[in-house]
Amino acid sequence: MSLPIAGLAQLSKGIIQVVGKDATKFLNGLITSRMLPNVVKKKQHTISENENRHANLSEIIDINNNWGLMHGDIYDPEENIFIGRDGLNSMFLNSKGRVTADCFLYSFPFHNSKGSFEEVLKKPNFLIEVDSRIIPEMESLLRIHKLSAKVKINTVSDIYSYYYYSDTMEFDELLEQVQDTYFRSVDPNEALVKANEFIESNLIFNSRVSSNIVGFSIDNRIPNLGIKILTNKPLNNDDQNIGVAVDDFFSESFQQSFRTNIISEDVINMRRNVNGLFEGQDADIDQTLLPFECNLDYTNGLSLDKGCYVGQELTIRTYNNGVIRKRIMPVQFFENNEETVDEISNQGYVNIDSSDKVVETLKMLNQTTLGKLDMLPLYDLPVENEESKSASPFASSPFGGESKKSRRRKASSGKIISQHDNVGFALVTLSEIERNDLFKIEVPSLEGGMRSVGIKVFTPDWWPEQEDY
């Protein structure tokens, strides 16, 4: 099965607005991304030369104004920090350092072309985009932490979330051009000017519908994966009378170069799965995960020098100790037979196939049941007893027989987080992947007894170069 080369999909996301004088400081204490301009280190001498370049950020950024967002990457050797109106990836954690929700955070409004949002720009204003299933819980969480902070928190029902991608070299080059030209600002005033220029450039959007674009972000969780768009009206095909027609939304030049057909959200989710980009919505709501297990450090969602926030202690300690034992990785399920094993052993990418026979086998199990099954190495070889290796006279059995080879009970190598058709995500022990990428689970068979289903784990090619597991 091949995915469409390009398309636009509406996402099942909900939006919460946080607005007010203390909005920046309030959110800085709750999310994993840096919001405040000052560098926080326990010891002054640990501030690097690159970080010193940004020492005057507190003079440039007035957090009491609608200033935008700071963008950084912990894997950037130059430790660049840019200020922009575009959105960023982040997470909310609980006090134990476990993920409450992943999110995209947007500076609202994205632009003020033609003075469309003059009134909104008068105070700090942010939009939080999360899985629509958890909107009530997220709004409650924000209100619990509000205390005396001067902010207003509201769920917004008339803002719509969209995702566009095009798997072409030309689109990748366009996004590079857009980022280099419009999203490399170093102060808030320039950031707003550049956002206005981008909207008016017609590179992607038709400037005539600028008043309908309230949020924008290049999705750099994986470099140039796509773009995220927030609108105040729904987008639709020409034959519908509500909202904005897609043909009117994108510029004429953009439509001449790229397809802009509407696709389903399922396509976006499957494309994420193929590329190994996990989101919280992929797992059961009650699933508890750590931010590093969700690869937050790989997807530009973590700051290491932002100071205190909920869940910080375990997160920073884990990073500094360098002990990350498990990560969520893309997997493909397959029929466990000799022919299929030989074929998939040499397969270097996730291949979606809804007609695969293994899909019927997996249909018998719900998500919760799958998550409880142990992932074990596909090849479970006999392991010789330690006693038989010893030269000690006590190595032999006291009952006169020779020591026998036994099978050491294998600990689970991981667990299934999600499954759709023949692909999914699994939380995998990294040390296992170094030795082997083929695993199995035992599932009930219609004929009675148990049946083995194979699993291949793929390491995404966009991950930073790995140290030894």
From Swiss-Prot:
Q: Which GO terms describe its cellular component?
A: mitochondrial matrix
Q: Which UniProt keywords apply?
A: Mitochondrion, Transit peptide
- The record's region (Disordered) falls at 387-415
Gene source species? Scheffersomyces stipitis (strain ATCC 58785 / CBS 6054 / NBRC 10063 / NRRL Y-11545) (Yeast)
**SUPFAM superfamilies, per database record:** Folate-binding domain
Keyword set includes NADP:
no
Q: What is the recorded name of this protein?
A: Iron-sulfur cluster assembly factor IBA57 homolog, mitochondrial
Which residue interval is the transit peptide?
Answer: 1-43
Q: Which family does it belong to?
A: Belongs to the GcvT family. CAF17/IBA57 subfamily.
List the biased-composition ranges (Low complexity). Answer: 390-401
InterPro entries cross-referenced by the UniProt entry: TrmE/GcvT_dom1, YgfZ/GcvT, YgfZ/GcvT_CS
Where's it found, cell-wise? Mitochondrion matrix
GO MF annotation list: transferase activity
Would you kindly state one Gene Ontology biological process term found in this protein's UniProt entry? iron-sulfur cluster assembly
Using the UniProt record, give the first listed, main subcellular location. Answer: mitochondrion
